[in-house]
Each structure stands twice: as C-alpha cells, then as structure tokens.
Swiss-Prot record:
Domain I is involved in oligomerization and binding regulators, domain II is flexibile and of varying length in different bacteria, domain III forms the AAA+ region, while domain IV binds dsDNA. One of its GO terms (cellular component) is cytoplasm. Residues 87-132 are annotated as: Domain II. The keyword Nucleotide-binding applies. This is Chromosomal replication initiator protein DnaA. It comes from Clavibacter michiganensis subsp. michiganensis (strain NCPPB 382). Residues 350-477 are annotated as: Domain IV, binds dsDNA.
Length: 477
C-alpha cells in the first residue's frame, strides 16, 4: 500500500479523480484501476505496480489513453508526463494482510476481508480444501494455455490472487468440454494455497437447485443460505441450467447479492454469454455483466497437441509426437473427447501388447471420429443401446441393483454418456435415478482403468460406441 505522506500518493489521487470523471472508464475498468499501486516518479515517468499480467495488459491497452489524458491534466509541478507498469504479484497478497481502507480513500472497490471459519454449531462447516468440492486433478499446473483460452486463464489467476478486487463476478462462457470447469477448480485450489482459511465452495447449478429444493422440503432454509453465503469464493458451474427455474433463480439472486455486497468473489460458467441467457430476468443478467466476461474457444492444433502431450505425461503414457499430432488433427471438437481418444488408443495398445503407431491409431479412430456438430447423440439412445447390448432393461440401469452385471453395464452407460454427449456430471447422474455426480465420476474413472486391463471391457465399450454412432447415422436400432 502506498504511503499517503509520499508526494506520489497525492499525484495518484489526482489521476484517480480525473479517471473517475472520464466517461470512457466503465465500472469494469475501474475495477482494474483499483488494483494499481503508485510507486514513484522518475524522470517524468509515474511508475505503477499491478498484481498480474492481465491488469497490466488492460492498463496498457484499454486504459492507456484515458490514463495519459489524466496525467496530462496534472500541473507542471507534478513533473509527470508518462507512466510505466511493473508486475508485482505480492500486491495481491498484501491486500489481505491489511485492513480495508476507509471508503473515502478507496474510491473504486473495497478490499475483501478473508475471515477464518467460526465455530457455530448452528451452521454447516465452512468449506476448506476437503469439503469445498474441488477436484484435485484440476489445477492451473495441469491447464494447457493457448490462444483459445489465454485471457480466460489470466482472468482466473487474477481472481484467485485477489478475490473480489476487480473482476466480480468473473463470467466464463463457451461450449462444453473446453476447460471452464477446470478453471473453476483451479481458482479454488490456487486461492486456498495463497490464503489459508479462505472459504471456497464449488457447485454445479444442478446441485444448487437440488439443495434449494431439499431445503424447502426439509424446512432448512437457513442451512441452505449459510452453505452458499458463508464463503469468500463461490464457484458455480453451468449457470444456464437455472434458466426457467424461477424459484431457484430467486434464491441464487439473493445469494449473489449477499456475497457481492460483502465483497466476496463469485465466478460463474455458462455455455452462453449473459445477453443470450434469455431464461433469466434482466436484473440477473445485468449482474452477470457487472464484472469481467470472457470466453473459451475450441483449441487450435498446437494447443490440442500440447493438451495430448500433457495428458500423456500425467498418465505416464509413451506416445510418439507424430502420433499425438495425428490425433490432434482428427479430433477437433473439445478437450474432453481429445483426452478420451488418447485413453482409448493407449488402452488398445496395452491390451494388444503393441506399440502405439499410425496404423493402430487409425484402427481405433475409425469408430471414434466425432459426428458433425449438428448431429448430436441423445443420452437416451446410449442408455437404450447399453441395456439392449447387455440384455437388460432400461429400468435395470436406472434402478438400484448392485449385481456385478448390472453395475458394470450402468457404469459403461455413464462412461459413454460422458464421452459422447455434452452433459455435465450432475446431469448424467440425474438420468440414472438421480445419482450423485460423484457416482458418475467414479464410473468414468473405473471404466477408463478397466479398459486398459480387461480386453472384454475394452471390446464392449468399443462395440457399443460403434453401434450407437452407426445407429445415429443411419437411424436404425
């Protein structure tokens, strides 16, 4: 924090006053400006520190002209004609080591206060790394950065480093399978590593809806409210699923307002930008636009190759670079299918005790190449085909039977729903008798592992995939 007795502080306050009066500076840009720390003047240059590259980029691009105009409005005695930006990540951490300044001294946005969990037997335990529902596999260290997601990644890092300081809410949108959920979990993990005791909760919109319905049915509204409002960071996935659910939207509206009013960070993902979420009231859509909106797009070839290479390294798979490149040219739709293809290829090689070469990859890929984007497989078709293949009924797959035959068939159906559709884990769980999303995660992981170990499982999954896609192409069961 700058010293108010330093002449630089007085200069910066005059610059801030000019920027406040500038119509070009939107509330979103004010958020970026609030992260700036003036550090001194040397040979006519005002040196400014910011916590991350994203903020530096915004100052040097979108805010550059208004900032130069503000500097130009200073009297000659200030001795300032230009500015320079220095990135100092310690600024973000310092923000939490001090008390928020009075409103008069902090003109744009108040620094959030991270509080330790309190012992209150009437409330649910505050989220920590253990109960924040974060997936340990999804961190920034496992996220592959490319041109399609670079800005979204930078924004996510900035939010984790300085929650509620500038981009609140952070709204990330894009098609399924492009890394939005990964970024949500990574924000949570990174924030917890920076600020021990910070309260983080991840939730899908389906889980939020179910919790809300259960709280009404069980007359436990206060517990529902504390579960989602007593957080420093709330990460909510696939907000589009709240469209048309008026009561749940109302609950989220009040949750959002409570968190935002108390300078707590909200991060939201969606498959559409706010203006296209027509199933929400205008007041909710406008709140989505209060902070920073960014998108993730389908990865380019170089990024797809890098994703495959990182996945191969994490799974300790030996795959030549030319094979990774070939797979990356053939699978272009999303990251989930790209990684699933790699698992299929290496599982086939392991079962047949053969090296991963071009001929093998071509054999495996012939039944895996994605259908046209408009030719979407319905989950009910997957379930029907799986039931017929294993000579079971659909009710068997939906039901509670734990016999090995039924359980394996159910897990394969869940795996295929995850691989061949864009449904989220909670949505797949709902299809199978309202099972929890963790059950779907377990099924996906188990079938992935069994495919490497048992030829029978690999053959069953491969044959079912082929049948489902052929049926979809030619319309016959």
């Amino acid at each position: 924090m700058s010293d108010r007795s330093d002449p630089t502080h007085a200069i910066w306050q005059k610059v801030l006053a000019a920027l406040t009066a500038d119509d070009r500076i939107t509330p979103q840009l004010h958020g970026f400006i609030s992260l700036v720390e003036p550090k001194g003047v040397m040979t006519g240059t005002l040196y400014l520190e910011v916590p991350n590259d994203l903020t530096r980029g915004m100052l040097e691009q979108r805010i550059r002209v208004p900032l130069l105009n503000a500097i130009g409005s200073l009297d000659e005695a200030a001795g300032v004609s230009n500015f320079a930006i220095v990135v100092n990540p310690e600024i973000a951490q310092d923000a939490f080591a001090q008390h928020p300044e009075p409103a008069a001294e902090q003109p744009y946005i108040e620094t959030p206060t991270i509080t330790a969990p309190t012992d209150n037997p009437g409330l649910p335990a505050s989220p920590s790394r253990g109960d924040s529902r974060l997936n340990p596999k999804y961190g920034f260290d496992t996220f592959v950065i490319g041109g399609s997601n670079r800005f979204a990644h930078a924004a996510a890092v900035a939010v984790a480093e300085a929650p509620a300081k500038a981009y609140n809410p952070l709204f990330i949108y894009g098609d399924s399978g492009l890394g939005k959920t990964h970024l949500l979990h990574a924000i949570g993990h990174y924030a917890i590593s920076l600020y021990p005791g910070i309260r983080v909760r991840y939730v899908s919109s389906e889980e939020f809806t179910n919790d809300f319905i259960n709280s009404i049915a069980n007359n436990r509204s206060s517990l529902f409210q504390s579960r989602y409002r007593d957080n420093d960071i709330l990460l909510i996935d696939d907000i589009q699923f709240l469209q048309g659910k008026d009561s749940t939207q109302e609950a989220f509206f009040h949750t959002f307002n409570t968190l935002h009013d108390h300078n707590k960070q909200v991060v939201i993902t969606s498959d559409l930008p706010p203006k296209h979420l027509t199933g929400f009231e205008d007041r909710m859509r406008s709140r989505f636009e209060w902070g920073l909106i960014t998108d993730v797009q389908a990865p380019d070839l170089e990024t797809r190759i890098a994703i495959l290479r990182k996945k191969a390294q994490s799974e300790k798979l030996q795959v030549p670079d030319d094979i990774l490149e070939y797979m990356a040219t053939k699978v272009t739709s999303n990251i989930r299918e790209l990684e699933g293809t790699l698992i299929r290829v290496t599982a086939f090689a392991s079962l047949n005790k053969t090296p991963v070469d071009l001929a093998l990859v071509q054999t495996v890929l012939k039944d895996l190449i994605t259908l046209d984007e408009d030719n979407v497989i319905a989950p009910v078709d997957i379930i029907n085909h799986t039931a017929a293949y294993f000579k079971l009924t659909v009710d068997d797959l939906y039901g509670s039977s734990r016999s090995q035959a039924v359980a394996t068939a159910r897990q394969i159906a869940m795996y295929l729903c995850r691989e061949l559709t864009n449904l989220s884990l909670p949505k797949i769980g709902q299809l199978f008798g309202n099972r929890d999303h963790t059950t779907v995660m377990y099924a996906n992981k188990k079938i992935t592992e069994l495919m490497k170990e048992r030829r029978s499982i690999y053959n069953q999954v491969t044959e079912l995939t082929s049948r489902i896609k052929q049926n979809h192409r030619y319309g016959k069961m």
